[in-house]
């Protein structure tokens, strides 16, 4: 039976939905983030019709909608976060919330009851992380190319197979990586142009079956091969985090690698110069506490930002 597992990392909480050692979904939370599903009592600061702005207990502002007609500025209400804050190119989107009374049921956080583990099965998180970092996923006969834009996440399909076969081969991979990248919001899929209506219908049917467990709305494929998916957006996907916080993602992975090496001695963590300022004293102190080893940091301009290395070296005399 699939099970959510979490690694309590330094500077992040990583989650995987695993069926044995097969990943089905993934996600990341960073400390201090306001997350979908959080409930809070906050003051309504501004109101325009059914929309407005409320103050979160952290002091941050939250966009709210579905306000009742008699809601008053300055009064306190119980809200539930429906979407975390989003950083996009050139702008920052505040978290979004609604009055708890307007939400049917609850907005569940799958990580809330996850089992904490020291580490995930070998290589599973690394494969997902590197795929999100590159924005490319290979499959037999082709590849998926992901691009994050302010309007939507775009998926381009490339390969050497005939258009119909390439499109059908891409469908199960699209379904798989939507959840592994924790994608939501507006998603555009650019299939190869299919000349016949029957070919387009075959791909639509394959998508319907592959996405049957993924809550969404979807358009039929148009004559240019474009399909649009709209799914609930809870917060930044792995792709969004790399698009807006690549150095932050790489710094956290560097710490994970350093935490995973074993043996007596000191930990030598070698990073690209851009990562060094992100490895603050609190994170390094926590790494030393967890590993019971001193940490040395070396700088190597020849390393890629994502390619930090960690190894055990002898203690200084």
Locate predicted features.
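Charged, low-complexity intrinsically disordered tails
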Residues: 11-27, 39-41, 48-52, 62, ...
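A short, contiguous, amphipathic alpha-helix enriched in charged residues
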Residues: 17-39, 118-133, 162-165, 169, ...
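Active-site loop/lid in soluble adenylation, ligation, and acyl-transfer enzymes
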Residues: 59
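Active-site phosphate-binding and catalytic loops of NTP-dependent enzymes
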Residues: 86-92, 130-140, 214-217
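Domain-start "cap" segments at the beginnings of catalytic or binding domains
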Residues: 108-113, 118-120, 128-137, 141, ...
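Conserved glycine-centered short motifs in functionally critical loops
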Residues: 140-316
């Amino acid at each position: 039976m699939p099970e959510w597992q979490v690694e309590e990392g330094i500077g992040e909480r990583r989650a995987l939905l695993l069926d044995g050692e097969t990943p089905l979904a993934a996600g990341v939370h960073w400390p201090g983030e306001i997350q979908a599903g959080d409930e809070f009592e906050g003051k309504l600061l501004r109101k325009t019709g059914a929309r407005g702005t409320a103050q979160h207990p952290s002091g941050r502002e939250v966009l709210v909608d579905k306000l009742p007609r008699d809601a008053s500025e300055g009064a306190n209400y119980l809200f539930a976060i429906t979407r975390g804050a989003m950083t996009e190119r050139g702008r920052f989107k505040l978290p979004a919330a609604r009055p708890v009374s307007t939400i049917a049921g609850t907005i569940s956080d799958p990580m809330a009851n996850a089992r904490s583990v020291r580490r995930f099965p070998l290589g599973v998180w690394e494969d997902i992380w590197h795929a999100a970092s590159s924005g490319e996923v290979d499959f037999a006969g082709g590849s998926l190319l992901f691009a994050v834009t302010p309007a939507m996440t775009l998926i381009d399909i490339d390969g050497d197979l005939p258009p119909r076969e390439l499109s059908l081969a891409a469908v199960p991979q699209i379904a798989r990586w939507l959840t592994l990248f924790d994608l939501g919001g507006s998603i555009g899929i650019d299939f190869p142009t299919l000349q016949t209506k029957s070919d387009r219908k075959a791909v639509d049917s394959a998508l319907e079956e592959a996405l049957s467990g993924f809550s969404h709305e979807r358009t039929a494929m148009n004559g240019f091969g474009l399909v649009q998916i709209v799914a609930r957006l809870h917060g930044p996907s792995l792709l969004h985090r790399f698009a807006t916080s690549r150095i932050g993602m790489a710094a956290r992975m560097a710490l994970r690698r350093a935490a995973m090496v074993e043996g007596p001695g000191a930990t030598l963590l070698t990073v690209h110069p851009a990562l060094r300022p992100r490895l603050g004293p609190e994170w390094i102190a926590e790494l030393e506490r967890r590993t019971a080893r001193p940490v040395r940091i070396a700088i190597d301009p020849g390393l890629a930002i994502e390619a930090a290395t960690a190894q055990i070296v002898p203690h200084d005399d």
